[in-house]
From Swiss-Prot:
Encoding gene, per UniProt annotation: ung
Keywords, alphabetical: Cytoplasm, DNA damage, DNA repair, Hydrolase
Protein name: Uracil-DNA glycosylase
Organism: Mannheimia succiniciproducens (strain KCTC 0769BP / MBEL55E)
NCBIfam families per record: PRK05254.1-1, PRK05254.1-2, PRK05254.1-4, PRK05254.1-5, ung
Residues annotated as the enzyme's active site: 61
EC number: 3.2.2.27
Length: 224
């Protein structure tokens, strides 16, 4: 069975990957504030091992405000107000999953620990500048991550929200995996079909059909 060490280890030796890291280090060395902090950039892989992945949620690039990003798509650190897209995710969960209570925080580690890979397609960003690292080469890396999951795992659920994620996931084998698409949960597009998509219950139904333990989407309502 593949591990992230195998997948990421292979990529780490590639010139394009070295170039990504050089660009990020150069930006940090120049005094720019880069999110997430260096020790959190690969958090998604630390918290959800390759053979434990059940659901993949693709984000775009990290939040670019102070103390928000910590390496998991859509998640923010404890003590930070949940951003608008995450609030819409919570609204959909409340509508979709019986008894779901909207938490007061946006810390999604509990999902990651159950097998939800919260993967941004670009892993770093400069403070206050959305998409500032979009051309660093991260997309190549995350394409290869998705390709490895597609090839070496079966019966995963991919939740692709918005055109960017859908384009990114276009080569996923629909015969081996469940691919669910909807507009992005951003306030600009959530009302066009994200709200009411029922992706969370559909994901659990698919896992159940394949005798895989479902995700408990409920988070602690507040962190102690």
């Amino acid at each position: 069975m593949q591990t992230w060490k195998d997948v990421i280890g292979t990529e780490k030796t590639q010139p394009y990957f070295q170039h990504i890291l050089q660009q990020v280090h150069a930006a940090r060395d120049a005094g720019k504030t880069i999110y997430p902090p260096q020790h959190d950039v690969f958090n998604a892989f630390k918290l959800t091992e390759f053979d434990q992945v059940k659901v993949v949620i693709l984000g775009q690039d990290p939040y670019h405000g102070p103390n928000q990003a910590h390496g998991l798509a859509f998640s923010v650190l404890p003590g930070i107000v949940p951003p608008p897209s995450l609030l819409n995710i919570y609204k959909e969960l409340e509508n979709d999953i019986a008894g779901f209570q909207i938490p007061r925080h946006g810390y999604l580690v509990k999902w990651a620990e159950q097998g939800v890979l919260l993967l941004n397609t670009v892993l770093t960003v400069e403070r206050g500048l959305a998409h500032s690292h979009a051309n660093f080469g991260w997309e190549t890396f995350t394409d290869r991550v998705i390709a490895a999951l597609n090839r070496h795992r079966e019966n995963l659920v991919f939740l692709l929200w918005g055109s960017h994620a859908q384009k990114k996931g276009q080569f996923i084998d629909r015969d081996r995996h469940c691919v669910l698409t909807a507009p992005h949960p951003s306030p600009l597009s959530a009302h066009r079909g994200f709200l009411g998509c029922h992706h969370f219950s559909k994901a659990n139904n698919y896992l159940q059909e394949h005798k895989i333990t479902e995700i408990d989407w409920q988070l602690d309502t507040q962190l102690s």
